[in-house]
């Protein structure tokens, strides 16, 4: 594809992670299947750099987001006789967040203003899929809105599409959106991340493949209830009115402790809004999948998946 024909939409939004591949699946057979829904600008089955054995997952990149949507709407997919699981690819930066790879149907929406009603949330988020439930959280005692809400969809892909797009405006105001995790999911994801010491469930270390020794679909990484549980300290929402603490103890935007107080204000936390650090979407010159991070492949000329993250084109620093 020439530069003049390069897609205008960020590559990150046009890419699908394909898990659960047969070890017999090749780049060609993967391409043959997924090009039914659009033009593929890249397609790769990830392999061990030494043995060349498939790691059981790959990536396909479409020319447009519309084609990605078409492919996701055509689920389930079967490649070489095996049902595979396509998911919207998570950037290396976002993959550092606990629960980034969990499959959930509920989102947390923070920073919403007091005059925001259910219809404002519905009007905005229904473009991403069918909404089942909208909950605007209020203080049990005073009934005052607490500045955050939960939206539950009928399909996890709606959530995945929302969270990779970063910036959302509801009722004229920017808001923060995250996957809503149960207390158990948050604790499990946090402990799992600490235990891995950076090698990552989706690669990271040179020896790591997807799921660290082909754990795809077994460790609960792609399952899990929606819902929300609160911080490891037992905070949560409701109870004694201690605010939304679910993301507090991991150094996220939502602060340490009670990120949102009962008036729905940020507690001296800076926002993510503004220019993205480090050029999160990178460029084609850095290879089809940017740096050596989780859920992403290294440029092919650097051999394989995982390994060093020093060449990453997906920014730096954790925001969760």
Curated annotation (Swiss-Prot):
Residues 4-94 are annotated as: Globular A domain. It holds the Pfam family RRM_1. Residues 268-305 are annotated as: Nuclear targeting sequence. Identified in the spliceosome C complex. Identified in a IGF2BP1-dependent mRNP granule complex containing untranslated mRNAs. Interacts with SEPT6. Interacts with C9orf72. Interacts with KHDRBS1. Interacts with UBQLN2. Interacts with PPIA/CYPA. The modification Dimethylated arginine is found at residues 194, 206, 225. Its main location: nucleus. It comes from the Eukaryota. One of its GO terms (molecular function) is telomeric repeat-containing RNA binding. Residues 197-216, 276-294 have a biased composition (Gly residues). Sumoylated. This is Heterogeneous nuclear ribonucleoprotein A1. The modification Asymmetric dimethylarginine is found at residues 194, 206, 218, 225, 232. Residues 14-97, 105-184 form the RRM domain.
């Amino acid at each position: 594809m020439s530069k003049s024909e390069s897609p205008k939409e960020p590559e990150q939004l046009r890419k699908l992670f394909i898990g659960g591949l047969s070890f017999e699946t090749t780049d060609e057979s993967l391409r043959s299947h997924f090009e039914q829904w659009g033009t593929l600008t890249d397609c790769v089955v990830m392999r061990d750099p030494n043995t060349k054995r498939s790691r059981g997952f790959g990536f396909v990149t479409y020319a447009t987001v519309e084609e990605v949507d078409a492919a996701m709407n055509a689920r389930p997919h079967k490649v070489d006789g095996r049902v595979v699981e396509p998911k919207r690819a998570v950037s290396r930066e976002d993959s550092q967040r606990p629960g980034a790879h969990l499959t959930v149907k509920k989102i947390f929406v923070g920073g919403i203003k007091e005059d925001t009603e259910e219809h404002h949330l519905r009007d905005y988020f229904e473009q991403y899929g069918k909404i089942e439930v909208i909950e605007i959280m209020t203080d049990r005692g005073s009934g005052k809105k607490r500045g955050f809400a939960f939206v539950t969809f009928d399909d996890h892909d709606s959530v995945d599409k929302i969270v990779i797009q970063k910036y959302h405006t509801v009722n004229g105001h920017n808001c923060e959106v995250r996957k809503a995790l149960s207390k158990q999911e948050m604790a499990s994801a946090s402990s799992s991340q600490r235990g891995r010491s950076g090698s990552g469930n989706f690669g990271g270390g040179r020896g790591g493949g997807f799921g660290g020794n082909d754990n795809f679909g077994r460790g609960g990484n792609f399952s899990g209830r929606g819902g929300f549980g609160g911080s490891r300290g037992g905070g949560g929402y409701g109870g004694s009115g201690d605010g939304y603490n679910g993301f507090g103890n991991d150094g996220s935007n939502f602060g340490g402790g009670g990120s949102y107080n009962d008036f729905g204000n940020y507690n001296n936390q800076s926002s993510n809004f503004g220019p993205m650090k480090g050029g999160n979407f990178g460029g084609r010159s850095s290879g089809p999948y940017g740096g050596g991070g989780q859920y992403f492949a290294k440029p092919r000329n650097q051999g394989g998946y995982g390994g060093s993250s020093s060449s990453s084109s997906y920014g730096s620093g954790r925001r969760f």
